[in-house]
Amino acid sequence: MKKCIGLGMAGLASLLWLAASSAYAKAGVDRVLLISIDGMHAIDLQNCINGIEGTPPFCPNLAALAQNGITYPNASTSRPSDSFPGLLSIVTGGSPFSADIFYDDSYDRSLAPPANPNNGINNGVPSPACVVGTPGPGTELKYDESLDTNWDPVSGVSTSINVPSPGIATTNLALDPMNGCSPVYPHNLMKVNTIFEVIKASGGHTAWSDKHPAYDLVNGPSGKGVDDLFTPEINSMVSAIPGVSVPGLFSCDTAVPDPDVADWTSSFKDIKCYDQYKVNAILSEIDGKTSAGQDIDTVPTLFGMNFQAVSVGQKLVQKVDVAATVTGGYQDAAGNPSPPLLGEIQFVDGAVGQMVTELKNRHLFDSTLIVITAKHGQAPINPALVNKPGDVVSPVLAAAGVNLVQVTEDDIALLWLENQSQTDTAVTTLQANAADIFLDTLYSGKSLLKLFQNPLTDPRTPDIIVKPTLGTIYTTSGKKIAEHGGFSADDTNVMVLAANPSIKGRAINAKVTTQQIAPSILSQLGLDPKSLQAVKIEHVPALPGLR
């Protein structure tokens, strides 16, 4: 004890680091490969590794991982189940209660609208709506492809999959009056830190790949959490991707299979090219290189990516010629995938197999924990339940004299009222028109406060959330047959699989959330889960079996 005191603060810090390193070594895990198969339900994993009603299984690589892995059939992602809060649940351990991010398209009453290209921060003049030192007047927060520096407002997509650095057009960002009317980058929205920041602070190397430059979000409040952030734009014009081929299917090197579609999400084939591009980045990182192939002789301590192929396979109705379409999704309530969806699931399984093979080739497999989950599910699974009435919520409220400053709709409706004193009127109106809006559950007042912050004091929390009946999507689009973002089990009951050769294969049926992944990753690396602010705020434990 006297020796410890005599070492002073620097020596004590060293001892603490050694203690952490000892726990790290004892766990036998040097790194974590984290994967989100967006849209992948728990039932999808069960079906693909076990087969459905006597049919053969169709995911040999996921099945092999499950042999030495823990599956969690009753895992739930965030509510709302949008990609932004869904990913933050995984990498912060927080729900929107602590992270305070509800959707990639939401609202903040304390911020000001973006500057415009001709009169904004690019030429040093603040937007007229932004007054330094005065909160508001409020603005939509839209963090998607429309932030890209090469986004084309006419086509609605970016002109290239590789968005030129720095990637995000500052004139499209909301402004913060309390910070000199400076632009609010996605990472500036963050109120809690991420596992990337904790691992980087402990000396680790970090990498992540996702679908928009707006996923700068994962950098956390510091803006520096991810050393190698690779974000090819998914909503960009399709084009050949040099060096990319989908094993056993087709090459994307000189041309894509469907060159005439709007973007990568509009083709069951092209989306495979897009995802394979990111898979190649992971393979490069396993080889001790950056996502771009630069040799750095370092394999990340935490790295990973999201897949979009399954999500596209669940949602898309693809027009293949003037008169014909191909429809994805499921064939029944049991989750039998349609042929297009089956192809996407098998592609992702094969891609996971590529990563496992490369880890083994580099003698890294035994010391790597592989965690596979999903930011969100997709609803409905049962195609008979699909109901697309369009926007029926806003007109009902408008007729009652209730104006909205923002409505965000998918298979959920998040409502921000212009006048928050009209909340009771809005609730009464919605309840009176329950059949017309296909209402299942309404969250406001006390029911909202059980999940989130108070919208009267928190500038981002919606005043009302409308959960519609299962299968209802507030759209009239003929291009999709499913959506996510909602609170239903189809939206939230996602796969979670944690695998390593040292793990005894089993299923743990306890109810868990994807929030528990973040503290689990840190504990497996010998780091303190309570280093995560959201974990402390919400008292989030590690996953059973990984504590």
Regions found by a protein language model. Give the residues of each.
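Short, solvent-exposed turn/loop segments enriched in Gly/Ser/Thr/Pro and often Arg
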Residues: 71-91, 209-219, 308, 533-540
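Short, structured active-site-proximal loop/turn typified by the sulfatase FGly-forming signature C/S-X-P-X-R
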Residues: 46-100, 205-207
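Active-site neighborhoods of enzymes that stabilize oxyanions during catalysis
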Residues: 165-175, 179, 188-193, 402-520, ...
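Active-site His/acidic residue clusters
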Residues: 213, 217-225, 289-347, 384-386
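Beta-strand elements within well-structured catalytic alpha/beta cores of enzymes
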Residues: 30-42, 64-66, 90, 199, ...
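Catalytic-site neighborhoods of secreted/periplasmic enzymes
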Residues: 132-254, 532
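Secreted, luminal/periplasmic, and some membrane-associated catalytic domains
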Residues: 37, 73, 80-82, 92, ...
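Acidic, His- and aromatic-enriched active-site or binding-groove loops in soluble protein domains
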Residues: 92-105, 207, 223-286, 324-345, ...
